[in-house]
Amino acid sequence: MRSLSSIALLSVVGAASAQAGPWAQCGGKSFSGSSECASGWKCQELNEWFSQCVPGAESTTPTVSSTPTPTDAPSVSITASATTGINKSISVSSASKSTPLPSSSSASPSPRPTGSGSFAKADGLQFSIDGETKYFAGTNAYWLPFQMNDADIDSVFDHLEQAGLKILRVWGFNDVNTAPSPGTVYFQLHDKEKSTSTINTGKDGLQRLDYVVAAAEKHGVKLIIPFVNSWDDYGGYNAYVKAYGGSKTEWFTNEKIQSVYQAYIKAVVSRYRDSPAIFAWELGNEPRCSGCSTDVIHGWATKISAYIKSLDPNHMVALGDEGMGLTIGSDQSYPYGTSEGNDFEKNLAIPDIDFGTLHLYTTDWGIKDNAWGNGWVENHAKACKAAGKPCLFEEYGMKGNHCTDELKWQKTSLSSGTAADLIWQYGQQLSTGESPKDAYSIFYGTDEWKCAVMDHMENVNKN
């Protein structure tokens, strides 16, 4: 997607001055605060920039690198704000309140999901899920981890399982710069005044994602979880920039920002690396670096994908991009170009990137003929075949008319050699009313649901 309207969601816990409080920073380069944690908590180093008080029996002082560093080195805390991709304006509902996340060796604020099933994997040009290698279909519901009502989450997974949709993409980020009102879900707070970040692992934080992962395990659905948004919705790059300086184009190479970003990745991956519900980790939602050399995103993606694999070698990793910068079949139009800093084929060749992703929004890209999308899908399938990796048709949609040209894109995806498709986006009635929606939403049980989902699933099952 392009940029969505967003509602920042926050709430933070303050730290004491004499001792660092629960989840507070207690060490790191250029950190001048207390390195002693409150009783029952210990100081654990997450990276050279940031050590955090996590549950533990004793207080310890972290080791700090003596390498010279800038005087404005970051301190990390995590908050929430929303972000997605396309030019879609959507209403966003709130979630809950919480605390930062401990490392995988520390006690977790809520039980980690441990369900049955096996890890999804790439199998040639296809995906294998729970031992079955075939074409799969799924959807996007970015808003699901921000729901506070467990029954709403269960209902969504009930409907997905009934429909046979095996893959669901949800936001694994929600970055904020200001604490939201109580009862609003956020995952990471980037304090602009203190240049610190805090991870929220409380009931209105990552514990909501915990429930989503557990529900996915129960229903046999696999999740794709991106770590940051290119767009300002739900925080995005700008939430980091507001706290640490620089610009969106500098986000990829800013040492302080990347340290905070990697600390968040470690917190989330460590939480779910043993879960069979994770289909793949994504570096971000629609990464873009406008006007940059394609080397910027390529270098960043090479480094971060390797880092994720070092934390979790069992799950797949993808970039989460739109598929821009493709030479195969190029008509020199905007999406085929590299103005947004992406080179699809170069990025796909990164060793730790397991599959390619492509998105499709003709209206948002200034394409007047929807039939253009068929070639877009086919050309990416050719690029993936050349690379020997699967292609995921990860986001696609139209503003209305979901039962016309959109169905042709689905048929092209089935016949061209892509491995799966995820329609944008799923909607249904929740306890609070309609789920967050945009012009692309397809609501459960409607006529559009039948044509765009149920009829498509019949074709998928015949494939």
From Swiss-Prot:
Q: What class of enzyme is it?
A: hydrolase
Q: Look up keyword Hydrolase and say if it applies.
A: yes
Where do the segments described as Disordered lie?
57-78, 93-121
**Reaction(s) catalysed (UniProt annotation):** Random hydrolysis of (1->4)-beta-D-mannosidic linkages in mannans, galactomannans and glucomannans
Tell me which EC number(s) this protein carries: 3.2.1.78
Q: For bias kind Low complexity, which ranges apply? A: 59-77, 93-118
* Signal peptide coordinates: 1-18
Q: Where is the CBM1 domain?
A: 19-54
Q: Any idea which positions bind substrate?
A: 171, 285, 361, 424
Domain text? Has a modular structure: a carbohydrate-binding module (CBM) at the N-terminus, a linker rich in serines, and a C-terminal endo-1,4-mannanase catalytic module. The genes for catalytic modules and CBMs seem to have evolved separately and have been linked by gene fusion.
* SMART domains per UniProt: fCBD
Q: Where is this region: Ser-rich linker?
A: 75-118
To which species is this protein native? Aspergillus flavus (strain ATCC 200026 / FGSC A1120 / IAM 13836 / NRRL 3357 / JCM 12722 / SRRC 167)
Give the span(s) annotated as Catalytic.
119-463
Task: Report keywords, A-Z.
Answer: Carbohydrate metabolism, Glycoprotein, Glycosidase, Hydrolase, Secreted, Signal
So where's the catalytic machinery, residue-wise? Answer: 286 (proton donor), 395 (nucleophile)
Q: Which GO terms describe its molecular function?
A: cellulose binding; mannan endo-1,4-beta-mannosidase activity
Q: Which GO terms describe its biological process?
A: mannan catabolic process
Gene3D superfamilies given in the database record:
Glycosidases
Q: Where in the cell is it found?
A: Secreted
Question: Where do glycans attach?
Answer: 87
Q: Which family does it belong to?
A: Belongs to the glycosyl hydrolase 5 (cellulase A) family.
Instruction: Specify the protein name.
Output: Probable mannan endo-1,4-beta-mannosidase F
The cellular component terms of Gene Ontology attached to this UniProt record, alphabetical and capped at eight, are: extracellular region
